[in-house]
Amino acid sequence: MGVDIRHNKDRKVHRTEPKSQDIYLRLLVKLYRFLARRSDAPFNKVVLKRLFMSKTNRPPLALSRLIRKMKLQGRENKIAVVVGTITDDVRILNIPKLKVCALRVTAGARRRILKAGGQVMTFDQLAVTTPKGQGTVLLSGPRKAREVYRHFGKAPGTPHSHTKPYIRSKGRKFERARGRRASRGYKN
């Protein structure tokens, strides 16, 4: 007798709407859904997809990284578009004139961008200015920068693994001897 095929893992998971009940986000989704359908520009489709994403997949972008990415050749006078938050970076002293569009900009970052003669736009303003995303640079924050990613990967304690172990304490007695120093068995 044959065994029937398991259908419990068949589903390909992709969001068709945001999980959030935020009415302002839902209005943006309505707008970009219209633009993605009516224009052939891939920009609108990408923005729409990113509006659906969870918060961990929309990591914050620091002002320093934004400046570094906008300094690249051919990106002057373009609008930096971030589907997420732009955060301030106190390590940066001189800020160039920037034109940015983001879901959220922290108070410090907003103040410094405007002080430098820049401009902060919302996504509905962007849709009016560039409905097809002409003259824009789509940026996103570092997704793997979260602390939890340090624990992922090859099991801690195996050769050539740099994975951070989950331990209750960082004391001398906790995962610091065997495999960490040559005098105690071996060193990775």
Swiss-Prot record:
Residues 161-171, 178-188 have a biased composition (Basic residues). GO terms for biological process: cytoplasmic translation. Keywords: Cytoplasm, Endoplasmic reticulum, Ribonucleoprotein, Ribosomal protein. The keyword Endoplasmic reticulum applies. It holds the Pfam family Ribosomal_L18. One of its GO terms (molecular function) is structural constituent of ribosome. One of its GO terms (cellular component) is rough endoplasmic reticulum. Coiled coil: none annotated. It is found in: Cytoplasm, Cytosol; Cytoplasm; Rough endoplasmic reticulum. Its main location: cytoplasm. It comes from the Eukaryota. Belongs to the eukaryotic ribosomal protein eL18 family. Component of the large ribosomal subunit. This is Large ribosomal subunit protein eL18. It comes from Ictalurus punctatus (Channel catfish). The gene is rpl18.
